[in-house]
A protein has these predicted regions:
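Activation segment signature within eukaryotic-like protein kinase domains
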Residues: 109-110
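A short, aromatic-enriched beta-strand patch in the conserved N-lobe beta-sheet
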Residues: 71-72
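Protein kinase glycine-rich loop
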Residues: 11-18, 22
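Activation segment
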Residues: 150-152
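Conserved short submotifs of the Hanks-type protein kinase catalytic core
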Residues: 76-90, 94
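Conserved N-lobe beta3->alphaC-helix segment of eukaryotic protein kinase catalytic domains
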Residues: 33, 38-61
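Terminal C-lobe "cap" of eukaryotic-type protein kinase domains
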Residues: 245-271
Length: 478
């Protein structure tokens, strides 16, 4: 654990990108929690410009479904943005590959996404990179739209301008973005429609919205007897067809989406959230084709410092050059993360907006971001590292030990696009937690790899009850 400024500790790294990192800061006295984005490549004009624009956009926004902005600070070559800490993790983590989620949960998330996007548009702001990796959840599982590195103001003083920059993530962008100037609102609405398909079906409908893509071509020709459309009931499919209309002038508006019968229907909630986590085989039993996205799907990806799903320094070497295995457990556990120990916000910021941060009696243990891609093991830290390295070799992964207790894995998804994730070993309640986090690529594809790893290590995974704070942090509350 490192001190950032007096009274504020860097508890853990939430994400990293080509130009910087996202850190979790916790106040040692008040237990306030703040997410801090760090730009350490201000020598790159484009990165610095995007950072500046992101700050300008954040200053315009204040909505319950938009990540809160607290302020920014500059220290020499480093720049910082301080944001609300969304401890519920990323939306993609709640999507079970090839299955999706219960309709009640999907509807709740979708309605909140739509509410946030409607607010953005009312302020004249277009997000331009809406996808589950850029949507976070707070401690109560409410949506927080984040990552405004590609956002732009499309309406000012009542005058709207067409957009021309081709940016976003290919499976989620609207077809008109690829071919001509476009209007901001219909393009964001299209992205929301693709997110809805992912929520309900656990897969993406196409690689990109172009006639060169067979899946998209089939959709335009109304071929809906194939996956993922067969996973949607008629009511949901009717809404998706209205949103994913190729002609933006005929596409549903947010007001029309809110009035659709699927959006207004009261679905009965089902307790299925823990099923994916607790079972090593349930998600594998649903074997249907899945269209996966990858880094090649990201175009104009110049907002990389913003989040965990952003880009990571390129290809690693195989791990045989990492030196001898440390002898003591403390040396192979992740440094800078402590759950045995736990100045004010305005002391840390310049140019602040004084807003309430998350402050409670929670310990740093409970502030561990919720994630389903983690498990406890029965082995000690040394044995766990050896098991992971051996398995990664067998799976053909390229891996590297970045620091004690952290292994970065590089592989490819089904599209041959790069997929990067990290495995962190954390000592918690006298046990070893292995925590996997996506760094680059598609979240659904990452979760498939996690399931493979979890199943292959099943004999070493701890079974039985855990303490309540740990259950909360690991999304395993019964």
């Amino acid at each position: 654990m490192k001190e950032f400024v007096e009274g504020w500790d860097v508890v853990q790294t939430l994400g990293e990108g080509a130009y910087g990192e996202v850190k979790l800061l916790v106040n040692r006295v008040t237990q306030e929690a703040v997410a801090m984005k760090v730009l350490n490549r201000s020598d790159l004009p484009e990165a610095a410009d995007n950072f500046r624009k992101e700050i300008c956009v954040h200053r315009l926004l204040e909505h319950e479904n938009i990540i809160k902005y607290y302020g920014h600070r500059r220290e020499g070559p480093l720049q910082f943005i301080f944001l609300e800490y969304a401890s519920g993790g990323e939306l993609f983590d709640r999507i079970e590959p090839d299955y999706g989620m219960d309709q009640a949960d999907a509807q709740k998330f979708f309605k909140q996404i739509i509410s946030g996007v409607e607010y953005l548009h009312s302020k004249g702001v277009a997000h331009r990179d809406l996808k589950p990796e850029n949507i976070l959840l707070d401690a109560n599982d409410n949506i927080r739209i984040s990552d405004f590195g590609l956002a732009t103001v499309f309406r000012y003083k009542g005058e709207e301008r067409p957009l021309v920059k081709k940016c976003g993530t290919l499976p989620y962008i609207a077809p008109e973005v690829l071919v001509k100037s476009y209007h901001a609102e219909p393009a964001d609405v299209w992205s929301c429609g693709v997110i809805l398909v992912a929520l309900l079906a656990g897969e993406l409908p196409w690689d990109k919205p172009a006639t060169s893509c067979e899946q998209y071509k089939g959709w335009k020709e109304c071929k809906i007897t194939v996956s993922p459309w067969t996973k949607l009931d008629n009511m949901a499919l009717s809404l998706v067809r209205k949103i994913l209309t190729p002609n933006p002038t005929k596409r549903y508006t947010i007001e029309q989406i809110k009035g659709h019968q699927w959006t207004r229907k009261m679905f009965e909630a089902k307790n299925t959230s823990s099923k994916w986590l607790s079972s090593t085989s349930d998600s594998l039993s649903r074997k249907k084709s899945c269209f996966d996205i990858g880094q090649t799907g990201d175009i104009a990806r110049d907002n990389a410092p913003t989040r965990v799903s952003s880009s990571q320094p390129d290809l690693m070497h195989r791990g045989d050059g990492d030196g001898p295995t440390p002898a003591a457990n403390s040396e192979v556990l992740a440094h800078g993360i402590s759950f045995s120990q736990p100045a004010h916000l305005e002391d840390m910021l310049l140019s602040t907006q004084t807003q309430g941060t998350q402050s409670s009696s929670q310990s740093p243990l409970q502030k561990l971001v919720k994630r389903m891609t983690r498990f406890f093991v029965t082995t000690d830290a040394n044995e766990t590292v050896q098991e992971l390295r051996s398995l990664f070799e067998k799976l053909g992964y390229v891996w590297k030990t970045n620091s004690p207790g952290q292994i970065t894995v590089t592989t490819q998804d089904k599209r041959k696009a790069q997929l990067v994730f990290k495995a962190n070993l954390i000592e918690m309640d006298a046990r070893i937690l292995v925590d996997f986090r996506l760094s680059r690529g598609d979240g659904l594809e990452f979760k498939k790899h996690f399931v493979t790893i979890r199943n292959r290590l099943s004999e070493h995974i701890a079974k039985g009850p855990v303490s309540w704070p740990i259950a909360v942090a690991t999304n395993s509350v019964p």
